[in-house]
């Protein structure tokens, strides 16, 4: 009887002895699971943040692609090989411009002419800029020659075509290569237009204000007042071309005078501090 009781009690006693150990094991297992879960969560978080990286990389790549496209789209600067006559004419006009403005520079060639124009554009008011250029043009040609041309070549088909042809032969050093084109004057075809595919002066400055105040306005005034020939200069600021139409009066509401300067491409403003408002 005692043996049976002992045998029956042993399993219960054994079970009772095992429960604390099992509970401890379960607790340790639970704690380890919690710890592992926490560690996994912490380790997982840094991996969640880079998920947006591809989007940023895509945006950066797109921006770089845009910049590269714009750079690739920019046309290369025209290279000019000036002859001895070109250099002589450029130096002569540059010196007259410097004397009229009182602003000297030590540069050579076309760079000297552009530097003289930049100095005028930086310092003087818009009206004064055109006045100085007109004075420089009058200095460049003796008054008796101007008077002789004005008297001997009154406005006519011949004089209009003569001025156009003369410009294409003797002034490519100033404006770049150009050619004579036809237009209709009083119902007749005349070769009175000079077409400049890319103006050298405009390309060198990339400035609308300098084009209008230091070239277009004073040249129109000088040719009409000193040579007796009406002329309308019509620049195209999209492709830097220009047309000189001899015999045509500039319109009062000239669209070129309303054109804002290039916001990001103006070399004169970005590199030389020119106020290119027109």
UniProtKB/Swiss-Prot annotation:
Tissues of expression: Expressed in young leaves, axillary buds, inflorescence promodia, lateral roots and crown roots. Expressed in vascular cells in the shoot apex of the main stem and young leaves, the nodal vascular anastomosis and large and small vascular bundles of the internodes.
Key words, A-Z: Chloroplast, Iron, Isomerase, Metal-binding, Plastid, Transit peptide
Annotated EC: 5.2.1.14
Keyword Transit peptide: yes
Membrane-crossing segments per the record: none
Pfam families: D27-like_C (PF13225)
Main location: plastid
Record text on cofactor binding: Recombinant protein contains about 1.7 mole of iron per mole of protein.
Phenotype seen when the gene is deleted: Increased tillers and reduced plant height, reduced levels of strigolactone.
InterPro entries (UniProt xref): D27-like, D27-like_C
Entry's Gene Ontology BP terms: secondary shoot formation; strigolactone biosynthetic process
UniProt enzyme class: isomerase
Cofactors, names only: Fe cation
UniProt transit peptide range: 1-40
Source organism superkingdom: Eukaryota
Note: Recombinant D27 protein expressed in E.coli contains about 1.7 mole of iron per mole of protein.
Function: Involved in strigolactones biosynthesis by catalyzing the isomerization of the C9-C10 double bond in all-trans-beta-carotene leading to 9-cis-beta-carotene and providing the substrate for CCD7. Strigolactones are hormones that inhibit tillering and shoot branching through the MAX-dependent pathway, contribute to the regulation of shoot architectural response to phosphate-limiting conditions and function as rhizosphere signals that stimulate hyphal branching of arbuscular mycorrhizal fungi and trigger seed germination of root parasitic weeds.
Protein name per the record: Beta-carotene isomerase D27, chloroplastic
Chain's gene name: D27
């Amino acid at each position: 009887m005692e043996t049976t009781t002992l045998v029956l009690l042993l399993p219960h006693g054994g079970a009772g002895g095992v429960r604390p150990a099992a509970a401890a094991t379960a607790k340790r297992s639970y704690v380890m699971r919690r710890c592992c879960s926490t560690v996994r969560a912490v380790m997982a978080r840094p991996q969640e943040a880079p998920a947006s990286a591809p989007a940023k990389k895509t945006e950066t790549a797109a921006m770089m692609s845009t910049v590269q496209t714009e750079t690739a789209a920019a046309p290369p600067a025209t290279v000019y090989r000036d002859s001895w006559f070109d250099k002589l004419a450029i130096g002569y006009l540059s010196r007259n411009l410097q004397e009229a403005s009182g602003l000297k520079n030590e540069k050579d060639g076309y760079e000297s002419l552009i530097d003289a124009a930049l100095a005028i554009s930086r310092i003087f008011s818009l009206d004064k800029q055109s006045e100085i250029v007109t004075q420089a043009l009058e200095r460049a040609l003796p008054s008796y020659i101007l008077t002789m041309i004005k008297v001997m070549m009154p406005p006519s088909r011949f004089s209009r075509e003569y001025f156009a042809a003369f410009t294409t032969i003797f002034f490519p050093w100033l404006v770049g290569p150009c050619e004579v084109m036809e237009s209709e004057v009083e119902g007749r075809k005349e070769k009175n237009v000079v077409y400049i595919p890319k103006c050298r002066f405009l390309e060198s400055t990339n400035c609308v204000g300098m084009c209008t105040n230091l070239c277009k306005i004073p040249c129109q005034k000088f040719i009409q007042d000193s040579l007796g020939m009406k002329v309308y200069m019509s620049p195209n600021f999209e492709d830097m071309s220009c047309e000189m139409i001899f015999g045509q009066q500039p319109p009062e509401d000239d669209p070129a005078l309303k054109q804002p300067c290039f916001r990001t491409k103006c070399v004169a403003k970005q590199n030389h501090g020119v106020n290119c408002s027109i």
